[in-house]
Amino acid sequence: MIYSKQEPIFDEFESLDKRSIGKSLFEQEANITLTDRGGEFTDAENMEKRDDGTRRTRVFYCDPMQSGQKGSLENMHRELRYILPNEVDLRSIGLTDQTSLNVAISHINSSAKEHLNGKSPFELCEFMCPELAQKLYEFGLQKIEKDEVILRPSVLTHK
């Protein structure tokens, strides 16, 4: 995730593509984007294509009211809401920049998942695509020890 005070979302795709993981790795690991029909995702063409017109990803939409079509992404969204609740001023709980967002994402991706046989998403990423894991760590994400994972808003102010 890229911290942004603005929409549209294609700016975040551009940032991931150019700054964070690079064009080649982005195409390899994010060649398909499955999303809901939220307003921030309406400009599929700009999400799919770079400034030079080359394709970066393909965007597909779930059917309306069918969040189950996004599988484990919905579970991750639920975990994100443990840290970043709806109806709360996110700045007031400590989400102020990319560093604080990285803290939240690091804790979520460090927690063991039953559907991954007790492994964390980071552990799976390190095994399946070490190059991507390295880029994520260079971007500022960190693997947190499983017994130190916090999935509450206090993680943003925890020292």
Predicted regions: what they are:
Residues 3-8, 29, 38, 67, ...:
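A short glycine-/small-residue-rich loop at the edge of a beta-strand within enzyme catalytic domains
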Residues 26-27, 53-55:
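Short, structurally constrained coil/turn elements
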Residues 45-47:
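Short amphipathic alpha-helical segments
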